[in-house]
């Protein structure tokens, strides 16, 4: 298999704005409730990091109205779009697994369907880093896998666009989180097609 991260980066680069168009056609309001929930637990002007921000819609656009927002994504094309879509926010092209921040840098971290694009072996270390980057009483909101699966799709969203995913089951994610030190504030299944994902809201 080609480098999984290269597959992800090239896939999102190839799709460009068509990635957002596809999901807006499916459900244009899919993130509204969870973004409101995230804002409600954060203090005004909180420092927030998004892992896998894509084109900045809707998360960066929404959060940057209320908090000091920073987004990272592996796709340069998506980051260019994000800078246009949320001009008051700060963005960086980066591999989320290679990020380095001082401890206690953020009040909140959000990752919607993004960490599951990392190889599974790299995910526990990223969650440990996220815990360290959070300030006391900080929050991590993430949507991860519901079942164990690693694979690719060579025709994702449109013909010829490749994509890679890797995730474990929800109980294993929860075990990781509690071992790291997170408190589980909320967990629920997010249906999608014939399967779905798992929402977690965690507190340090």
What is the predicted function of each stretch?
Residues 49, 54-98:
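Class I SAM-dependent methyltransferase SAM/SAH-binding core
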Residues 124-136:
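A short glycine-rich, Lys/Arg-flanked "PGG" loop and its adjoining helix->strand segment in the class I
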Residues 138-144:
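Conserved beta-strand signature within the Rossmann-like core of class I S-adenosyl-L-methionine
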Residues 145-164:
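Short, glycine-/aromatic-enriched active-site segment of Class I SAM-dependent methyltransferases
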Residues 165-180:
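Short alpha-helix
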Residues 180, 189-204:
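Core SAM-dependent methyltransferase catalytic element
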């Amino acid at each position: 298999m080609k480098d999984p991260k290269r597959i992800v980066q090239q896939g999102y680069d190839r799709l460009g704005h068509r990635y957002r168009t596809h999901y807006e056609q499916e459900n244009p309001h899919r993130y509204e409730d969870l973004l409101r929930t995230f804002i409600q637990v954060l203090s005004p002007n909180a420092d927030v990091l998004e892992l896998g921000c894509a084109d900045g819609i809707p998360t960066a656009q929404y959060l940057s109205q209320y908090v000091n927002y920073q987004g990272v994504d592996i796709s340069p094309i998506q980051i260019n779009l994000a800078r246009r879509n949320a001009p008051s926010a700060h963005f960086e092209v980066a591999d989320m697994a290679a990020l380095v921040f001082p401890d206690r840098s953020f009040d909140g971290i959000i990752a919607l369907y993004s960490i599951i694009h990392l190889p599974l072996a790299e995910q526990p270390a990223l969650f440990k880093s996220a815990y360290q980057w959070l300030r006391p009483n900080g929050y991590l909101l993430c949507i991860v896998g519901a079942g164990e699966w690693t694979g690719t799709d060579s025709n994702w969203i449109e013909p010829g666009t490749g994509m890679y995913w890797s995730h474990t089951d929800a109980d294993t994610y929860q075990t990781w989180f509690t071992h790291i030190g997170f408190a589980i504030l909320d967990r629920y299944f997010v249906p999608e097609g014939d399967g779905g994902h798992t929402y977690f809201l965690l507190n340090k």
